[in-house]
Amino acid sequence: MISDIPKVGQKLSDILSEKFTYEDLRARDKISKEKRSLRNLIKEMEDEVLASAGVDSFEEIFKLIFTKLYDELICANDKTAYLKFRNSGDTDFELKEKIQGLFDDAKKKWEGVFSDESKILLSPSHLAVCVSTLQDIKLFNNNLDVVDDAFEYLMSKAQKGEKGQYFTPRYVIDMCVKMMNPTVNDKIIDTACGSSGFTVHSIFKVWKEIRLSKGLEPGEDFTASERTADERDFVRDNVFAIDFDEKTVRVARTLNLIAGDGQTNVLHLNTLDYSRWNEVTKQEDWNDTYNEGFKKLKKLQPKGSSDFSKFHFDLVMANPPFAGDIKEQTILSHYELAKNDKGKWQKKVGRDILFIERNLNFLKPGGRMAVVLPQGRFNNSSDKYIRDFIAERCRILAVVGLHGNVFKPHTGTKTSVLFVQKWDDKLCPQKEDYPIFFATMQKPSKDNSGEKIYVKDGNGEILLDHHNHFIVEHDLYNHDGMTQDGIAEAFVEFAKKEGLSFFQ
């Protein structure tokens, strides 16, 4: 058509460029339409492009996901806007310029994840292939699974599983959230946050309650739409997360910034080595990024305490690293569990053991905790002193045994989730004899190679929920009324019968 001849100042790409809205992306989304996973698309990108690109795969893919999330956010909130994260008609050099500009805008929107000077390092031709691969994937979805799956893959490659640090599957997190029942008044922290799943899913649960209390539609969870003031305030004032790994913290901050509409208290600190926090937090670079959140965390110390040894949280949920021992005496000297059952200091102590004590010290009286631990801590006769330590300080609410495939392919270590509530005269009066809820996960949720097993319909087709997401086959809870009640529902019934304070 004559009208399509470029005007003065227009490039050919301006004419060829496909006008593509967020609604178009929803309709074309490869994940729901072709049943592709972002993890597998990234693997393909690595094999075809990144292996020969001479760049840090984690950093460059992180930049692209970060940029694409920003592009989706802008277009979801402005129905007339067109997505820019697309390869349609641009030369490779024009595309790189466009994507770099988008990345720069994203950095301004979500500060403290990438430095101001950070650039996309992929060559124009490599970037063009990567953008084409990612452009028809909708990253904003209901439950973070899409993005989280990709980040877990990238992190596991970057870290090679050092320190036994693996992301907790979202279905395990959701079970814990349903059983611990966070509310709008709770102060919540994850002390070994990984990608921050426990806190983000707690946010989703509380947001639903806030919206329902105001007569609003619950809406999507991890969504591009704006939040109410009450929803933002909850994230700003009540939700915290800590991790010692800088890359992990940046991923967690990204997900929290987006889910929390610009609010985040994710901090780069060594949870166990709190005697050095004063030293770490005085560093200028650290301060620029994390000071706002740290000031709020300091206020949650009990009266008269200022050494970061104790805090006043209502709820701690965590999956601490369970590989490797702590040998530094400067750290061990702060922990009672660093002594053996005869009261003598040990030369080395399992990291997860110290996390048990540290997590309990984050809780106020009546506070509750869900923590993933190696199964041996519940059975080994040599670990009896740990079980005694917990029982003296808390009511043991529940122990849920997870299937051995849950953390595959990273590890086949058998794990259980421990749920406790700290003794308190009002919320959890001390008693010697009380029932404990025990359950064991029967459905593996993953096959032996670590691939998720999905629920299928009567024709053998993978079943999609009403958000167009796959449903992992497990027996931890009922998935939006589409699967049977599971362990979480049975615990809620138990908790109400027992009159537990957080279900009254």
Which ranges hold each PLM region?
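Conserved S-adenosyl-L-methionine
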Residues: 165-296, 311, 315, 323, ...
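Active-site-adjacent bridging/hinge elements
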Residues: 32-43, 147-152, 225-227
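Charged, often flexible domain-edge or linker segments that flank or initiate folded functional domains
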Residues: 1-106, 199
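Class I SAM-dependent transferase core
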Residues: 45, 146-171, 177-180
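Short acidic-aromatic active-site loops that bind/stabilize oxyanions
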Residues: 140, 162-166, 344-349
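Long recognition/docking surfaces used for binding and targeting
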Residues: 61-62, 66-157
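Generic recognition of flexible, low-complexity loop/linker segments
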Residues: 52-53, 177-178, 227-229, 238, ...
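A conserved structural/catalytic subdomain of Rossmann-like adenosyl-cofactor enzymes
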Residues: 5-24, 274, 280-504
